[in-house]
Curated annotation (Swiss-Prot):
<dbReference type="GO" id="GO:0005886">
    <property type="term" value="C:plasma membrane"/>
</dbReference>
<feature type="binding site">
    <location>
        <position position="132"/>
    </location>
    <ligand>
        <name>a carbohydrate</name>
    </ligand>
</feature>
<dbReference type="GO" id="GO:0019899">
    <property type="term" value="F:enzyme binding"/>
</dbReference>
<feature type="compositionally biased region" description="Acidic residues">
    <location>
        <begin position="231"/>
        <end position="241"/>
    </location>
</feature>
<keyword id="KW-0732">Signal</keyword>
<feature type="binding site">
    <location>
        <position position="104"/>
    </location>
    <ligand>
        <name>a carbohydrate</name>
    </ligand>
</feature>
<dbReference type="InterPro" id="IPR021720">
    <property type="entry name" value="Malectin_dom"/>
</dbReference>
<keyword id="KW-0325">Glycoprotein</keyword>
<dbReference type="GO" id="GO:0005783">
    <property type="term" value="C:endoplasmic reticulum"/>
</dbReference>
<feature type="signal peptide">
    <location>
        <begin position="1"/>
        <end position="28"/>
    </location>
</feature>
<feature type="topological domain" description="Lumenal">
    <location>
        <begin position="29"/>
        <end position="269"/>
    </location>
</feature>
<keyword id="KW-0256">Endoplasmic reticulum</keyword>
<comment type="function">
    <text>Carbohydrate-binding protein with a strong ligand preference for Glc2-N-glycan. May play a role in the early steps of protein N-glycosylation.</text>
</comment>
<feature type="binding site">
    <location>
        <position position="82"/>
    </location>
    <ligand>
        <name>a carbohydrate</name>
    </ligand>
</feature>
<keyword id="KW-0472">Membrane</keyword>
<feature type="region of interest" description="Disordered">
    <location>
        <begin position="221"/>
        <end position="265"/>
    </location>
</feature>
<dbReference type="Pfam" id="PF11721">
    <property type="entry name" value="Malectin"/>
</dbReference>
Length: 292
């Protein structure tokens, strides 16, 4: 007889299957598979203190995080929805909008976020490259209160085209000090998140939020098949190279031939025989010469 836990597990599995079969418009943004399994992230929306959909409208993601409309609209930079025509890999279908819109600027730009309480926080930056199709086309830095927390970000080089990429930056605020990535600075109540103009095109961001907690509390993107395969191939290549090196070394050892014998370790009697022969020939010859 099945226990209560087995019946409950079967019911949840059937509900997930049913939700997957329903079109997104019917099941709504809050009823995705992540919503069924949302018990693990039940407190996530409450821990998020600030969230913005850069270049886009307000949106509530599958985890319940409420992204507000971009406060820089009409003030700084330009909004773009160029990515709306593209599907975004690694993202939940309901949340692709967070990566399809963006804000960029021809100069350094950023956001100010007031922080009232001390504690541990995490800054999550969301990106997707929807325009360029090769690396070294858009490269920029990200600064947090003057600290460079992301250096030379090349989104395409990291994950490829139209693929979600999150930068997760933990920090702590205590006793008037901001600590991030091993650096400390004076904190005056506001976080300044800057996207720094570099040599390659313009800086941008798709969405971002700040939450109280640690990196372990941040929802992760879906796995990237291309990156996983590449990592596996690199591991196999390193293993093969090591094996080949070992085999080659052994092969070279065989080809080098047997060890050269030590001449000092051989028997000295083998050297005495030619000496005795020479001495035996020399004495009679000398005797004959003396009689002449």
């Amino acid at each position: 007889m099945l226990g209560a836990w087995a019946v409950e597990g079967t019911a949840v599995a059937l509900l997930r299957l049913l939700l997957l079969l329903l079109p997104p418009a019917i099941r709504g943004p809050g009823l995705g598979v992540a919503g069924v399994a949302g018990a693990a992230g039940a407190g996530l929306p409450e821990s998020v203190i600030w969230a913005v959909n850069a270049g886009g409208e307000a949106h509530v993601d599958v985890h319940g995080i409420h992204f507000r409309k971009d406060p820089l609209e009409g003030r700084v930079g330009r909004a773009s929805d160029y990515g709306m025509k593209l599907p975004i890999l690694r993202s939940n279908p309901e949340d692709q909008i967070l990566y399809q819109t963006e804000r960029y600027n021809e100069e350094t730009f950023g956001y100010e976020v007031p922080i009232k309480e001390e504690g541990d926080y995490v800054l999550v930056l969301k990106f997707a490259e929807v325009y360029f199709a090769q690396s070294q086309q858009k490269v920029f830095d990200v600064r947090l209160n003057g600290h460079v927390v992301v250096k030379d970000l090349d989104i395409f080089d990291r994950v490829g085209h139209s693929t979600a990429h999150d930068e997760i930056i933990p920090m702590s605020i205590r006793k008037g000090k901001l600590s991030v990535q091993g650096e400390v600075s004076t904190f005056t109540g506001k976080l300044y998140i800057e996207f720094v103009k570099g040599y390659y095109d313009n800086p941008k961001v798709c969405a971002l939020y700040i939450m109280a907690g640690t990196v372990d509390d941040v929802p992760k993107l879906q796995p990237h098949p291309g990156l996983e395969k590449k990592e596996e191939e690199e591991e196999e290549e390193e293993y093969d190279e090591g094996s080949n090196l070992k085999k080659q070394t052994n092969k070279n050892r065989v080809q080098s031939g047997p060890r050269t014998p030590n001449p000092y370790a051989s028997d000295n009697s083998s050297l005495m025989f030619p000496i005795l022969v020479a001495f035996g020939v020399f004495i009679p010859t000398l005797f004959c010469l003396c009689r002449l």
